[in-house]
A protein has these predicted regions:
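Short, solvent-exposed secondary-structure boundary motifs
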Residues: 33-36, 108-114, 187-189
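A short, glycine/Asx- and small/polar-enriched loop/turn
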Residues: 1-5, 47-54, 63, 190-194, ...
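A short, local hydrophobic-aromatic micro-motif
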Residues: 6-7, 44, 54, 66, ...
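Flavin-dependent oxidoreductases
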Residues: 46-157, 163-176
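General beta-strand structural signal in soluble alpha/beta enzymes
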Residues: 37-39, 70, 130, 180-181, ...
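Helical element adjacent to the flavin cofactor pocket in flavoenzyme catalytic cores
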Residues: 9-67, 71, 75
Length: 216
């Protein structure tokens, strides 16, 4: 549906990557460069001396390092608190649905973003994915993100999301005629101004952050 569209922008050099595959590729590259990756270990403290980071304490002991990078996703705020660093970051509910198979869908189709509908659309394994970003999203676990929450889901609130879903269907009317294969709600972390937090922190030298990237 385009009769209400005033203008559009096509950015030919944009693209998307599978987050899991990209992470595994970065991990392989790091190992090739000599890095050692330790999984299933929790950081219990950030060690510092005279305003500068010296390493971390973990459930397997201490690791000395002149640099520490906080890229803990929605746990980054809690990790920062260990170092005395304040990171304005909050997890909020994010929704998307995947339709049944849709004719004409293929991997080379561009991603469509529609700010007025608070939605984005893209191909997903021969189906259409519709992602919804509410103007004011519902926060999730204000006090603390559970340490053991990983790849989990939140019970979706159909009543609250129905108006946004109906608006999203209007842009691609054919999607409303398809069945829903998956309606997903999960937490993603955002900053108040929707800008990512990247760089060295002012509170602690050599303590870097890369978080809030879902705000992009």
């Amino acid at each position: 549906k385009l009769d209400d569209v005033i203008a559009g922008f096509y950015t030919a050099e944009d693209g998307r990557a599978n987050a899991v595959d990209l992470t595994m590729s970065l991990a392989r590259g790091a190992k090739m460069g000599g890095a050692k990756i330790i999984e299933g270990v929790s950081v219990t403290g950030v060690n510092q001396d005279n305003g500068k980071v010296t390493g971390v304490s973990t459930t397997m002991g201490s690791i000395e390092s002149p640099y520490v990078v906080n890229c803990a996703g929605m746990w980054a705020r809690q990790f920062g608190e260990m170092a005395g660093v304040n990171l304005p970051l909050q997890a909020a509910e994010h929704y998307y649905l995947i339709t049944d198979d849709m004719d004409g869908m293929h991997r080379d189709l561009p991603i469509l973003e529609d700010p007025d509908s608070h939605a984005y659309y893209r191909e997903e394994m021969g189906s259409l994915m519709i992602g919804l970003f509410e103007p004011v999203a519902k926060s999730w676990n204000l006090e603390r993100i559970p340490d053991n929450f990983s790849f989990g889901e939140i019970e979706p609130d159909w009543d609250r999301m129905a108006p946004f879903l109906e608006k999203a269907y209007e842009r691609v009317p054919a999607s409303a005629e398809l069945g829903i294969r998956k309606f997903f709600c999960g937490p993603e972390s955002f900053t108040p101004d929707l800008s990512p937090l990247v760089g060295e922190t002012p509170e602690l030298n050599n303590f870097f952050v890369a978080c809030g990237l879902n705000s992009l």
